[in-house]
Amino acid sequence: MNYKKLGNSDLDVSTICLGTMTWGEQNTPKEAFQQMDFALSEGVNFWDTAELYAVPPRKETYGHTEMIIGDWFERNKKRDKIILATKVAGPARDYLRNGENSFVGKNLENALNDSLKRLKTDYIDLYQLHWPERNVNNFGRLGYVHKENDWSQFEDVLNELKKYIEKGKIRYVGLSNETPWGVMNYLKLSNDKSLPRMMSIQNPYSLLNRSYEVGLAEVSIREEIGCLSYSPLASGYLSGKYRNGKFPKGSRMERDFDFWTRYRKPNTEKAVEEYYKISKKYDLDMSQMSIKFCEEQEFMTSVIIGATTMEQLKTNIESVKVKLSEEVIKEINNVQKIYPNPCP
């Protein structure tokens, strides 16, 4: 396994991060336990979850993933072996705390304490803001509509997080689904007012969505706030299993087709087919090629992988052993030029 510093913290995290969002929906607790056991045995010391999980998010499964992880900690007594990341949900989920989903006051206090209780731990290594309080364009949405009173409480949020860092409930903090403008506002306040510094940005990044490179890559490198990429396989498209419009029974697209609209774009299958041809030409597993491409980016701290089977998990973790030649990278970049970011 490979390791990198999380931002400018003292934490060395594996460059493969264990994703968990299927646990409690597509995966049973028993299957999740098997994944955690295996991932740790392979040196994956960085695990990511969220209060909102399992996914697709529903009131009935809210918090289930954290509870499964907490049960594993209780049974195995290996909390100290894991760098644990979770996320507090932003606005738009009315069933969470009666819709009071700001990142300050009682809402944050309740969210944090509830996560700690479900996870059966007294601290979280990386506490992330799942998405901004303000309206932002994501998942390829165009036509930004500015609302004068739509604002993020940057300084108040950092002061609130500082309280829980000082209490020992949080070690470090991070962002998710954030924009360059939002990231820089947080960093400026941290520098100017000696407030907690954001250590990471958890945003989508894959062969089908390299939009992170446009603005956030520079921020990550210059400011030492690395990317934690989610959806490196574009919810399975870059494994090749959805080629020719086929959705295998039990797969994410077959189960929750209406939820994953971000991948149903005109050039998705065309780009996937070209990447598939590259993997076959150079005798590479398509999933491993896709994950390794993400891991090798200078701005990348860790690639979050998810799996519904042990076979998938083993394949994805073994991507750290793969080498991508200059020829492979060149051909990948050529596909990007023909089909630029089909699933932003």
Regions found by a protein language model. Give the residues of each.
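N-terminal binding-site loop/beta-alpha segment at the start of enzyme catalytic domains
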Residues: M1-T86, D122
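Short beta-strand segments at enzyme active-site cores
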Residues: F46-A50, I83-K87, Y123-L129, G174-N177, ...
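Active-site gating/metal-coordination segments in enzymes
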Residues: D94-Q128, P204
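Short, acidic/polar
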Residues: N27-A39, V104-R118, V183-L187
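N-terminal small/glycine-rich loop or linker at the start of catalytic domains
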Residues: G7-Q26, A85-G99, Q128, P132-R141
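Beta/alpha (TIM)-barrel catalytic core signal, keyed to glycine-rich beta->alpha loops juxtaposed to Asp/Glu
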Residues: P132-N334
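Alpha-helix N-cap and loop-to-helix initiation/capping positions
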Residues: N27, E31, E60-H64, I68, ...
